[in-house]
Amino acid sequence: SKAIWGGLSYFLLPTSFCFRIFAAMMSDCSDKELELLQIIGSCAQKLNVPCYLVGGFVRDKLLQRGCKDLDFVCVGDGIALAHEVAKQFKPQPPVSYFKNFGTANIKHNEFEIEFVGARKESYASHSRKPEVESGTLEDDQKRRDFTINALAISLQKDDFGQLIDPFDGVNDLEAKIIRT
């Protein structure tokens, strides 16, 4: 079924379908990957920052491919979440951050982890440089390049693992289509 959220049609996948997708995706995750997702979800909950696994990792796991780059969108301060997550690792890795863009990176074992605050981008007619402001998950998904990179998995306690697919990216993956 479809729902309208902020003027955008979202495909709300039936719970049983979402569970199958999540189960298939998680069965392909290593113990280290699952532990990492649980740590990040717990830290996000502690900071009261909704957090979503997005982009290439979600896409690649659905395709049963390996991926060591994990991207997280936070509806709130992604840099603060990165610092909180880094505290959970021994030894504690440094956090590289770019305050102007609200992004932070951690290298932990073989993983490259990026946190970004959800953002909205707009462009002036005379510029290719975006004007950036804080946004919602929906805003962040709208700015993504391809439908398959707008896929998101919730890390919230109440709906952990819920797939959010606003642009029908799962069907595009199955059809082997790259669509903007």
Please provide the spans of the model-predicted regions.
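Compositionally biased, intrinsically disordered low-complexity segments enriched in Pro/Arg/Gln/His
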Residues: 12-13
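Catalytic cores of the polymerase beta-like nucleotidyltransferase superfamily
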Residues: 20-180
